[in-house]
Swiss-Prot record:
PROSITE patterns: AA_TRNA_LIGASE_I (PS00178)
Pfam families: Arg_tRNA_synt_N, DALR_1, tRNA-synt_1d
Motif 'HIGH' region per record, residues: 126-136
Coiled-coil positions: none
Enzyme class of the recorded protein, top EC level: ligase
Family, per entry: Belongs to the class-I aminoacyl-tRNA synthetase family.
A GO-annotated cellular component: cytoplasm
Protein's name according to its UniProt entry: Arginine--tRNA ligase
Gene responsible for this protein: argS
UniProt-listed PANTHER family: ARGININE--TRNA LIGASE, CYTOPLASMIC, ARGINYL-TRNA SYNTHETASE
């Protein structure tokens, strides 16, 4: 049970009885207060209603507080500040939730707000010009954990990777591999500026030389090299994702979309709707006047759907713009039945949000929607020095390098220790420490401690009676565990999987603090030889903790530890 949704529902029901039509007000808060002394749940409903009723929030709060006090779940109600209503729940409510956790086990927190709706989540989509470097890991983990969250709340998820295999960067890559092919045949080469000098291209050149000999030197057509190179590098990328525990259901090629005529089809669809025209764009503010000339262009009426400017569909040389390829790609997604889409992009793609939303609205007649989530950079440090990454320089840290250094689970967890749009620092020393400063260790240690208690507890105990759990520490841990369904729903709704990380740390801290009480007060220990009933109740609490931590770690595909290695 999501206790916060339950109280919210009771509030709406009460409002409907008090004033007809007021139940339509839904943008109010029902959540735990930051200060525990202010109760278990607070709401700002009085302040929201004050705008409609044209009364002081405190006056409304006084009326509502008396009504809320009649709820079966409520022990007492208080009014605070300008009109906040603080509610203290009856202790029986928390004991009941504890029983529910142990009944549902790791299914506690599983919801069905998605109603089996199909949703497409595109993430990683790294350019196929080299192995997956660690800079891509954040987006990969973000997308993968987000899809697990969406499945937990009832969505039918398709995980997709868009292969950017059309354009100048691929031509540059093919030329770079061609040089490595010549090198493998014994020729001396010189890698000119702008090409990819990475050592990872050497094996591809050697494989081409072994398979084709000198045959490809005499051909003007580079399709064989192109296809072999892209296939080889995509396998390298998949290998990196596999090491990180990330997989995709669908890989869509930009090159194949262009070959299939999807760009022309999607542009025609927009044109038939009157959304494509020939016109002139104003000079972009980011460009100097000498680098830009006004010209007649094929434009999409993006501003009709909330964008800042209309968008060019063709380049000066007559070829399609990258945005035109994006239109075709999302037209393809919609054609495959996806009306709900999420795409995770690097923070440098912030300018794409409005145009993507505009074209989705235009293509679907406002029936489809897309959520764009940006993930910021990760700063890596090695021996106190920044580790820089660049494919063209050939020096970059791969996913394999990091996973072999610190492990898959640590890498996945650390990538979500900050909100996705914030810069993240990854300290190779700290993430391997067995201390509170290492987030994944702190959570796993709570799980290990819990299992140690269960192993050491008497095998024969009476049936657990949760009503014996009354101390502040015990109740605080129960209340923290009870938040899990609300955390899951909020994290999924906002596409913010870092909330799971923060929550697991909160659970671990509450448990470690409670465990620590037993050091100074023997009566606070979980296992009491002279009190089997209280021991059984506390082990019941420990069991609930184990279920919630296991459920949370499953979002990361991390196996909870029972013993420290």
């Amino acid at each position: 049970m999501n206790i916060f949704k339950r109280i919210s529902s009771l509030i709406l029901s009460k409002l409907d009885k008090l004033k007809q039509g007021v139940s339509s007000v839904t943008n109010f808060i029902v959540e735990p207060p930051s200060n525990r002394a202010h109760g278990d749940i607070y709401t700002n409903i009085a302040m929201v209603l004050a705008k409609h009723e044209k009364k002081k929030p405190v006056e409304i709060a006084e009326v509502l507080a008396k009504e809320f006090a009649l709820f079966d779940e409520i022990a007492r109600v208080e009014i605070a500040g300008p009109g906040f209503i603080n509610m203290h729940l009856k202790i029986e409510v928390w004991h009941g939730i504890l029983e529910q956790i142990n009944e549902l086990k790791t299914e506690f927190g599983t919801l069905n707000i998605g109603n089996n709706q199909a949703i497409n989540v595109e993430f990683v989509s790294a350019n196929p010009t080299g192995p997956l470097h660690i800079g891509h890991a954040r987006g990969a983990v973000f997308g993968d954990v987000l899809t697990n969250l969406l499945k937990k709340v009832g969505y039918r998820v398709t995980k997709e990777y868009y292969i950017n295999d059309a354009g100048a960067q691929i031509d540059t890559l093919v030329r770079s591999v061609y040089l490595r092919y010549k090198e493998a045949l014994g020729e001396k080469i010189s890698i000119e500026k702008g090409l990819y000098p990475g050592e990872y291209l050497k094996p591809i050149g050697e494989e081409l030389a072994k398979k084709y000999g000198r045959e490809l030197l005499e051909k003007q057509d580079n399709r064989v090299i192109r296809e072999y190179t892209l296939s080889s590098i995509l396998e390298l990328i998949k290998e990196g994702m596999n090491l990180l525990g990330v997989s995709h259901d669908v890989f869509t090629s930009e090159y194949e979309l262009q070959k299939s005529g999807k760009i022309e089809k999607s542009i025609k669809l927009l044109s038939d709707k009157g959304l494509v025209y020939e016109g002139y764009l104003e000079k972009p503010k980011s460009k100097e006047s000498e680098n830009w000339t006004s010209r007649k262009e094929m434009l999409f009426r993006s501003t009709e759907f909330g964008d800042d400017v209309d968008r060019a569909l063709k380049k000066e040389d007559g070829s399609w713009t990258y945005f035109a390829s994006d239109i075709a790609y999302h037209f393809d997604k919609i054609s495959r039945g996806f009306n709900n889409m999420i795409v995770a992009l690097g923070s440098d793609h912030g300018g794409y949000i409005k145009r993507l939303k505009a074209v989705i609205s235009a293509l679907s007649d406002n029936q489809a929607k897309i959520e764009v989530k940006l993930h910021n950079v990760v700063n890596f440090f090695e021996n106190g020095k920044p580790v820089k990454m660049s494919k063209r320089s050939g020096n970059f840290l791969t996913v394999r390098d990091v996973v072999e250094e610190v492990g898959r689970d640590i890498t996945r967890f650390i990538m979500l220790t900050r909100k996705n749009d914030m810069v993240l620092d990854f300290d190779f020393t700290k993430v391997k420490e067995q201390s509170k400063d290492n987030p994944i260790f702190y959570v796993q240690y709570a799980h290990v401690r819990a299992h140690s208690l269960m192993r050491n507890a008497p095998k024969e105990l009476p049936k657990a009676n949760p009503s014996l759990l009354k101390t502040n520490g015990e109740l605080f841990l129960i209340k923290t565990l009870a938040k899990w369904p609300d955390v899951v729903e909020t994290a999924a709704r906002l596409c913010e999987p870092h909330r799971i990380t923060f929550y697991l740390l909160e659970v671990a801290e509450a448990f470690h603090i409670l465990w620590g009480y037993g050091k100074s007060d023997l009566n606070m220990r979980f296992i009491l030889e002279d009190n089997p009933n209280l021991t059984a109740a506390r082990m019941f609490l420990v069991q609930a903790l184990v279920h919630v931590i296991a459920s949370g770690l499953s979002m990361f595909n991390i196996e909870p530890l029972e013993e420290m290695k």
